[in-house]
Amino acid sequence: MNINATLIGQSVAFFIFVIFCMKFVWPPVIAALHERQKKIADGLDAASRAARDLELAQEKAGQQLREAKAQAAEIIEQAKKRGTQIVDEARETARVEADRVKAQAQAEIEQELNGVKDALRAQLGSLAVNGAEKILGATIDQNAHAELVNKLAAEI
């Protein structure tokens, strides 16, 4: 194998080509590789942050759901209590109204009973006077004996 000038010329050209590539071609390629590496790292970081954010959002959504369920249960409990209270108030109002109607009816019955008793006393007094007239066969003075009849009616 002979080393001749062509081989040396080719070696020099090759070294010049390598130096040229290292000086002008290699830096943009390295910069592109670093930029691509940075984009990939940023993408992985963003994915990691997104996964953490997703976990936090799911946890927060679960917490809000639990709070909403608890609040709904509390509202339902309050509604049940209010419903029971309304029913109790209605029962109490109905009982008071029934007592009032009962008392009013009792008073009306008492009043009518007293009226009937007074009417019966008056009729009894009149019957007693008529009976005494028939027994005695003579007319009895109504004015003179009205006081006697009233006393008799009051005793009855």
UniProtKB/Swiss-Prot annotation:
Keyword Transmembrane helix carried by entry: yes
Assembly mode: F-type ATPases have 2 components, F(1) - the catalytic core - and F(0) - the membrane proton channel. F(1) has five subunits: alpha(3), beta(3), gamma(1), delta(1), epsilon(1). F(0) has three main subunits: a(1), b(2) and c(10-14). The alpha and beta chains form an alternating ring which encloses part of the gamma chain. F(1) is attached to F(0) by a central stalk formed by the gamma and epsilon chains, while a peripheral stalk is formed by the delta and b chains.
Purpose: F(1)F(0) ATP synthase produces ATP from ADP in the presence of a proton or sodium gradient. F-type ATPases consist of two structural domains, F(1) containing the extramembraneous catalytic core and F(0) containing the membrane proton channel, linked together by a central stalk and a peripheral stalk. During catalysis, ATP synthesis in the catalytic domain of F(1) is coupled via a rotary mechanism of the central stalk subunits to proton translocation.
UniProt entry keywords in alphabetical sequence: ATP synthesis, Cell inner membrane, Cell membrane, CF(0), Hydrogen ion transport, Ion transport, Membrane, Transmembrane, Transmembrane helix, Transport
Organism from which the protein derives: Pseudomonas savastanoi pv. phaseolicola (strain 1448A / Race 6) (Pseudomonas syringae pv. phaseolicola (strain 1448A / Race 6))
Family stated for the protein in its record: Belongs to the ATPase B chain family.
PANTHER family with a match to the protein in the record: ATP SYNTHASE SUBUNIT B (PTHR33445:SF1), ATP SYNTHASE SUBUNIT B', CHLOROPLASTIC (PTHR33445)
InterPro entries: ATP_synth_B-like_membr_sf, ATP_synth_b/b'su_bac/chlpt, ATP_synth_F0_bsu_bac, ATP_synthase_B_chain
Molecular functions (GO terms): proton-transporting ATP synthase activity, rotational mechanism; proton-transporting ATPase activity, rotational mechanism
Membrane topology: Single-pass membrane protein
Pfam families attached to this UniProt entry: ATP-synt_B (PF00430)
Gene symbol of the encoding locus: atpF
Name of the protein: ATP synthase subunit b
CDD domains, A to Z: ATP-synt_Fo_b (cd06503)
One Gene Ontology term, aspect cellular component: plasma membrane
